[in-house]
Amino acid sequence: MTNPFDSAGSKAPPKPFTVSEGRREVRSFVLRQGRFTPAQQRAFDERWPRFGIDYNGQPRDLDATFGRPAHKVLEIGFGNGAAMRFAAQHDPSRDYIGIEVHAPGVGRLLNALADDNADHVRLYHHDAVEVLQNEIADGALDEVRIYFPDPWHKKRHNKRRLLQPAFAELIVRKLRPGGRLHCATDWEDYAEQMWDVLDATAGLVNRAGPRGSVPRPDWRPQTHFETRGQKLGHGVWDLLYDRT
């Protein structure tokens, strides 16, 4: 695999990808470079060939990628990687795929994976919609996790939120029947939108009933996003959906 960043970290991000939804386009995250620490830069230089997946826009055989058949869990927007690392440490029988656009977060997790010798984890530094549409086969995933996505809390920016109908339908296609979607947010308004979208998406059933949430499952640790939200007086909503 090639290093997605040269030693100067100068790769220009591609144009954001979109999913058409009527007359409106739903955008995934925009690649964000951020600042590298020397350790994070070394992570890309030294760890990416082992744990990274270079996006090429072609369907991928995930069992071949990991060298085994196992349940496949995708986390979209893993941030600093704490939740993914926790899951990989506590259930190594599963294979984990992470997508994150913030390069320093990717670098941090690369170093952690090397420390853990976690060869059952692979990372993308790319647009989530492009990865799902072009590299993940329909029915290839057992679970999709989306923890604390950007709430775009200003009303005029709500349309930029990730959980839109077109994106939910894309996730349904990639989950096998019997698979699971787990979302978490500390913004009540975003939880309301998630219910609006996901409860109405064919192929998804809310495990807690319409407009319901569940207690934080033991496979999701309390993240720094969650802690920050609680300090601001926000609640936290975990939404769990089964793929029919």
UniProtKB/Swiss-Prot annotation:
Pathway of action: tRNA modification; N(7)-methylguanine-tRNA biosynthesis
Annotated binding of substrate, by residue: 154, 186, 223-226
Domain of life: Bacteria
A GO molecular-function descriptor: tRNA (guanine(46)-N7)-methyltransferase activity
UniProt-annotated binding residues for S-adenosyl-L-methionine: 75, 100, 127, 150
A cellular-component GO term for this protein: tRNA methyltransferase complex
Residues of the active site: 150
Keyword list, A-Z: Methyltransferase, S-adenosyl-L-methionine, Transferase, tRNA processing
Ranges where the record places region Interaction with RNA: 156-161
EC numbers on record: 2.1.1.33
Catalytic activity reported: guanosine(46) in tRNA + S-adenosyl-L-methionine = N(7)-methylguanosine(46) in tRNA + S-adenosyl-L-homocysteine
Enzyme class: transferase
CDD domains associated with the record: AdoMet_MTases (cd02440)
Start and end residues of each stretch annotated as Disordered: 1-22
Similarity annotation: Belongs to the class I-like SAM-binding methyltransferase superfamily. TrmB family.
Function according to Swiss-Prot or TrEMBL: Catalyzes the formation of N(7)-methylguanine at position 46 (m7G46) in tRNA.
Alphabetized NCBIfam families for the sequence: tRNA (guanosine(46)-N7)-methyltransferase TrmB (TIGR00091)
Name this protein carries in UniProt: tRNA (guanine-N(7)-)-methyltransferase
Chain's gene name: trmB
